[in-house]
């Protein structure tokens, strides 16, 4: 994630949402020789038009694009930093409002939109607000989550401002929220202390699988360019996450400091990424964090803790005037609830 000024943000608004999960994978024969089916990844501009109409009272620009199936015919799309204000002929109105942190869009089966934020259109602010201490501004950027029996379980990462420029912010902690799906009101929240104990930014990919919930996060070096993935596992007790344990490379441990990186991921994984189950496999999709950030890769595993293998380059971002307009690309998102299964390798 990164905070950007308005000019940068306007240039890199989500023009496309990549529904990559529909065209990701190839099949493998039993002899371990790949039987490759060439599949073309297509850009999908329809969702941008549906989720971010240029006119109206909703979000017309933003990053994040993290989606969660609300299990009632609606889908939640969570944006990080975002814009409110009309866009006409690809130009943003002068009275557009910039919101730091998070805003939500809910789309129903009819394609109707509901936008969730605090304040009003003249002075909008983040939907889930971070408590302030009067020192430096603090905010939540959205992580990932899931729905179970009418409750949205949601992870949010708290940051604070520590300097100027696009990277003048600092990670503070991971908080776990529960919201009522019908009203989208917060029921309660709980801090995840493991994130501060072992340095893993938990909650940026979450996967319900069999009888457990797997909570993934990256741990980066001091430069932020190199990062590995760690995973925690929890149970639902009275529809609330409890009994957290952490993968140490061989078994699950109650001590969060025993965590170890997941094996087999050859690229530096982006701050936000995707993990989901598909055809009895576990799939991880990530944008390249360092090197060529335009590249989007997938990996597969037989279990949620890996090891992962079968690295595959899915797509390379090819946006017109990318360098000329000083665009940035990061944190690709997959939307498995819209998946049309083809093959997996």
Residue ranges of predicted features:
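Conserved small/polar residues in nucleotide/adenosyl-binding loops
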Residues: 342-344
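Structural signature of eukaryotic scaffold interfaces centered on beta-propeller domains
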Residues: 63-70, 135-148, 200-211, 269-278, ...
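C-terminal motif of bacterial Sec signal peptides marking the signal peptidase cleavage site
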Residues: 26-27
């Amino acid at each position: 994630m990164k905070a950007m000024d308005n000019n940068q943000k306007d240039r890199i608004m989500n023009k496309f949402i990549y529904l990559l999960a529909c065209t990701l994978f190839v099949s493998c024969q039993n002899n371990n020789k790949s039987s490759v089916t060439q599949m073309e990844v297509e850009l999908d501009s329809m969702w941008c038009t549906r989720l971010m109409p240029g006119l109206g009272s909703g979000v017309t620009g933003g990053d994040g694009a993290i989606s969660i199936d609300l299990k009632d015919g609606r889908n939640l799309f969570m944006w990080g930093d975002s814009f409110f204000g009309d866009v006409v002929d690809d130009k943003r109105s002068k009275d557009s409002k910039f919101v730091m942190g998070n805003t939500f869009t809910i789309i129903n089966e009819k394609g109707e939109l509901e936008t969730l934020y605090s304040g009003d259109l003249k002075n909008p602010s983040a939907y889930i607000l971070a408590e302030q201490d009067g020192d430096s501004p603090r905010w939540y950027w959205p992580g990932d989550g899931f729905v179970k029996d009418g409750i949205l379980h949601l992870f949010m990462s708290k940051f604070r401002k520590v300097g100027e420029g696009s990277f003048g912010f600092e990670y503070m902690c991971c908080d776990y929220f529960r919201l009522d799906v019908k009203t989208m009101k917060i029921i309660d929240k709980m801090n995840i202390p493991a994130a501060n104990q072992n340095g893993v930014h938990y909650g940026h990919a979450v996967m319900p699988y069999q009888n457990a919930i797997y909570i993934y996060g990256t741990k980066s070096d001091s430069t932020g360019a190199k990062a590995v993935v760690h995973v925690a596992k929890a149970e639902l007790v009275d529809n609330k996450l409890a009994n957290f344990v952490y993968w140490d490379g061989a078994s699950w441990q109650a001590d969060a400091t025993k965590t170890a990186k997941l094996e087999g991921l050859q690229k530096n994984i982006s701050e936000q990424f995707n993990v989901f189950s598909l055809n009895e496999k576990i799939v991880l999709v990530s944008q390249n964090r360092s090197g060529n950030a335009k590249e989007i890769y997938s990996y597969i595993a037989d279990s949620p803790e890996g090891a992962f293998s079968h690295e595959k380059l899915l797509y390379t971002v090819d946006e017109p005037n990318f360098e000329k307009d000083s665009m940035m690309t990061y944190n690709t998102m997959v939307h498995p609830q819209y998946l049309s299964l083809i093959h997996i390798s």
